[in-house]
Each structure stands twice: as C-alpha cells, then as structure tokens.
Amino acid sequence: YTIDTENENDSIIKPLMNFSELINVSDIILQLLQIFYKNEIENINKKINMPITKKKTYDFLNQLIILKKNFELKVDDFVANGLNAGITKVMEQIEYIYVLNQSPKDYCPDESNLDKKPSICCFKVINILKIHCQMISKSLANKATLEIYNQEITERLFQLILKNLKKNIVNVEGGNNLINDLKHYLHFVEKELKMKKLKILFTSLINVGLLYTINLNEEESEEQNIDSGDEKLREKKKFNRNKAIGKDIAKKICDSSLYHGVFTQDEVYDLVSRRIDWYNIKPFVDKGVYGLDCCII
C-alpha cells in the first residue's frame, strides 16, 4: 500500500479490492466446509454398517468438531486483522487528504460562503470513505461484523476531524463553513454507515462549531461609524464587544447539555481557543468559565 500523490482514490482501491475478494473466497470455503460436514460427517452413520449415533458428531471432544471450529476462528481472526489494517490505511489516506487539500482559508475566509457547499477536503474525504465502505459492505455477509466495522470507521473519522480542527484558525465566516462540513459528515454517518447511535458525536461537535459563529454585528457596525478621532470611545466599544462575546461563549462552554457528555468543559475550551479573536476575548471567557472575576467578601 502506497499513497498516490496524483489520485488519492486509486492508491487504496486496488488493495481494497484484493481484500474484498479474499473475504469472498473465505466465505465460499467456509460454506463448502459446512456443506461437506453436513452431508458427509453428520450422515456418516448412513454410509457405514457400524451404528454410530448422531450425538457423537456434535461431541465437543470430537477432533473433527475441534478442527472445524479452529479453522473458522482462524478465518475470522484473519478477516478482523485485515479489516483493522484496512481502516488504518483509510485513515492514513484521509490524513493525507487533509494535509494536501485543507486550505487555511476554508475555516478562515475573507468572505462568507454563500453557496453552503462543503469544502473540497470534506468532499474528498467522504468520497473515499464511500468507496471503501461500499466495497466492504458487499463483502461482509455478517451484519454484526459490518456494524462493528462501521462503528470503528465513525469513531476514527471523528477523532481525525477533531485533530484537523485543532490545526486550523477559525473566524466567524469560517465557523459557518465548518458547520457545513460537519453536517455533511453527519449525513454520511447516518445515511451511508447507518450509525445513528453515534450521530451524537457530530451533533455535539456542531454545537462546538456554533461557538465560532458568535459575533455582535450591531456593535461592530456602530464601531465603524465612530469618528476616527475619538480613539477612546472606539476602544471602549471594542472592549464592550469582546466582553459580551466572551461572556456568551463562556455561558455556552459551561452548558454541558449541549455536548451530551462527548466533550468535557476543558475540551470545549481548548477547541474554542482556535477562534481568530481568542486573545481578545480570552480574559472574559476565563472569568465566566473559571470564575476568575469572583471575590470573597
């Protein structure tokens, strides 16, 4: 497995196809083994003159039963290890896509994204996951195994999104773009992976994304109308604006019901620190979150 720098999809399709074919071959072998066992071993008493009770063919000490079970377990182990390796490689591919395609302007643009479309990076990540998961779902006959596989994909994808978010600076317009991307990830998890029970991960992250969009547009417009000579009034307006934003953010950070236990207060605080105006609002957020403005009388 190697990453193709020109086409991110091609480098993963070939090994994935080979593994899918191996899964199908292993299923066929197990089915043939089961048919042979049922027709030849279980009915052996009908083919020989010695009376052999059917009970002995199901005896857990029977060497045939032991060998058959061991073979089935070994095949299951190989499939599980292969799936784990496949997930690891897909996640490596997604990390590469983030490095190659995630622009700093995606979440910190100069202008707002009016078309509400996902970023190119988000589109490519979802595309490669669709290819991978569709091929695996066609290869795995066991629904329980497929559900565990999709759950692992969902959880690892969530961790990669978090890791990527912590590398970016986000402004108000970029916060809206981030929410658009997160909604597309959520749609993929719900519709393609059928992991509705894990949608809470992405809904919680969307609520975190809303913290990046908190802004006071009215205050900003008033500040621009102030005469350039009145610098003190301008600074006061800016101070009050940052104070109001900081208090609003602190209030939402402390509201644990928004994050459904997915994020702790400190984790939300850490994510919010990626705001572009963080150092302007940090003192007010600290006062609201940690009670640094409280005093003992």
What is the predicted role of each segment?
Residues 1-297:
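Extended alpha-helical "rod" scaffolds
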